[in-house]
Amino acid sequence: MMRGVTMVLLLPMLVWAGSECKARCCLTNISITVESDECGSCITVNTTACTGLCRTQERAYRSPVAPYFQNTCNFRDWTYETIQLPGCPLGVDSSFTYPVALSCECSQCNTEITDCGAFSMQPSSCHTHAYY
C-alpha cells in the first residue's frame, strides 16, 4: 500500500521536473488573436512571451521611506514582427506588428513599455480563425 501512495505522490513531481520552465521566468510560446473590423478577418498569431515566477519577499513592515517593489517576469530582449492581415480592401493598412520575446528576466515592471496591470486568464477569440 505504501508503494502505491509513493508513486501517486511522485508522479506530480516528475511531471513538474519534466517541464522546461519549471516555474522560473523563461520564454514560452503563446498565441495572440487579432481581429480587424476593416479587413473582416480574425487570425491567431503564434509568438513568444515571458512567463513564470520570480523570487520576491513580502515585508512584514512597509516603511514609507524605503521603496517597495516586486520583480516580475519581463522581456529582456525582444524584436517585432509584422504580418499582413488578409481580406483588407484597398486603402486600408493591413499590417499588424507584434512583439516577439527573445529572452526574459526578473525585474521591475517598466510602465513606459509594459502594461503592468492584471492579466486576463480568459482566452481571447473571435468567430473564425486562421493560423499564421
Curated annotation (Swiss-Prot):
Signal peptide annotation: 1-17
GO molecular function, one term: follicle-stimulating hormone receptor binding
Gene (name only): cgba
PROSITE patterns tied to this protein: GLYCO_HORMONE_BETA_1 (PS00261), GLYCO_HORMONE_BETA_2 (PS00689)
Disulphide connectivity of cysteines: C25-C73, C39-C88, C50-C104, C54-C106, C109-C116
Main localization category: secreted
Glycosylation positions in this chain: N29, N46
Entry's family note: Belongs to the glycoprotein hormones subunit beta family.
Listed Pfam families: Cys_knot
Domain of life of the native organism: Eukaryota
Subcellular location: Secreted
Recorded GO CC terms: cytoplasm; extracellular space
Family matches, as InterPro entries: Cystine-knot_cytokine (IPR029034), Glyco_hormone_CN (IPR006208), Gonadotropin_bsu (IPR001545), Gonadotropin_bsu_CS (IPR018245)
Assembly with partners or alone: Heterodimer of an alpha and a beta chain.
GO biological process, one term: positive regulation of estradiol secretion
UniProt keyword list: Disulfide bond, Glycoprotein, Hormone, Secreted, Signal
Protein name per UniProt: Gonadotropin subunit beta-1
Role of this protein: Involved in gametogenesis and steroidogenesis.
